[in-house]
Amino acid sequence: MSDQPAADAALSGLRLNLRILSVVMFNFASYLTIGLPLAVLPGYVHDVMGYSAFWAGLVISLQYFSTLLSRPHAGRYADLWGPKKVVVAGLAGTLICGLCYALAAFSSAVPLLSLLLLCLGRLVLGVGQSFAGTGASLWGVGVVGSAHIGRVISWNGICTYGAMAIGAPLGVVIYQRGGLLLLAAAICLISLTAMLLALPRPQVKSSKGKPLPFRAVLGRVWGYGVLLAMGSVGFGVIATFITLFYQARGWDGAAFALTLFSVAFVGTRLLFPNAITRFGGLKVALVCFAVEAAGLFLVWGAEAAWLVRVGALLTGAGFSLVFPAIGVVAVSRVPPQNQGSALATYTTFMDLALGLTGPLAGLIIAHYGVPVIYLLSGMLVCVAMVGALWLGRRAVGEK
């Protein structure tokens, strides 16, 4: 995206943040529609509809696969149409998802049809999320300039998990009051409101530099994307299976654990806004991976609900800065006119990890129980620590 005039580069921190928030709030709306059913759908598919943990995980993960496949198209259409139109298209996708949920509620007497409608809704939601999320990031960079891309990434993430922190418990309350149908109505209302707010906003100009082909961008960022993918598994198992973990233990309060994860995520970004600039992305990522792994191991071995909550808190705090810390390094590997493409390519690794986590973890649960997925996820994050060390040493060697 093109930089704004020099005067904009001197924006005060508050004004800069407000300008970013005025755009990434649309990603907040998109993720609110994701967070609302997050603590409801796994149990609904498993307990109400009677399907296995594999299908419960697959319903959630279909969204991530859809996001993965549509992310490159979101970046391409952002270049063709501008990020604003891509954001509006993404919000239209979340609206359609809400309608699919409503139809699934009406079809509850036919479980297979209801399941297919839920799956269709999750697929459309994935497209909507990739368009809204990618478009909001590029829109934010266009508003404040590419010099502030790290800040845009951080605020976009705060909106993402802030929406989930609000959405998970709110979705449980809505579901308890009116079932899946009322939850679907809430999703439709949020999506429509966000679309109406986005439409009057001005467009931003796209960069006129010659973009690198996708293969070239991928070649420069894939190593950092792999680290992101391994770190994202911890988020995936918390978000998708913490409800089933609580049920297996006979505990209540899974939605609160999700909220703690999201609160820790947002709080860490607010408490350490300059950590990446001060210490460097890979050094920050190392510390984050260590904290995330500790949280996952704690959940695995928890014998009391409060230990799971502490583990979720640590996992959220650790995962918080993983995306921007590694992302800033990844984006710096390409010319400025290709930063949007690099960011989208980098993000697809998280989409892939989250898409694989649901069904694979569901299969593992079917054979070995729920707790073991947190042990394996913690071990994978430890591998990411080794990878970050290696990339850091390679970067020093290149200098």
Annotate each PLM feature.
Residues L18-I60, Y64, G236-F245, R249:
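Helix-loop boundary and gating motifs at the non-cytosolic
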Residues F28, L113-F131, V308-L321:
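Hydrophobic core of transmembrane alpha-helices in multi-pass small-molecule transporters
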Residues Y64-P72, M164-A165, F265-L270, L354-G355:
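Residue-level signature of mid-helix packing/kink "hotspots" within the transmembrane helices
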Residues L69-S107:
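Conserved MFS/SLC helix-loop-helix module at the cytosolic interface between two early adjacent transmembrane helices
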Residues S70-G82, Y175, T268-G281, I365-A366:
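Helix-to-loop junctions at the C-terminal end of transmembrane segments
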Residues A92-P111, V291-E303:
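C-terminal ends and interior cores of transmembrane alpha-helices
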Residues G121-C159:
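Cytoplasmic helix-loop-helix junction between adjacent transmembrane helices
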Residues C188-S206, G387-G392:
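C-terminal membrane-cytosol helix-exit motif in multi-pass small-molecule transporters
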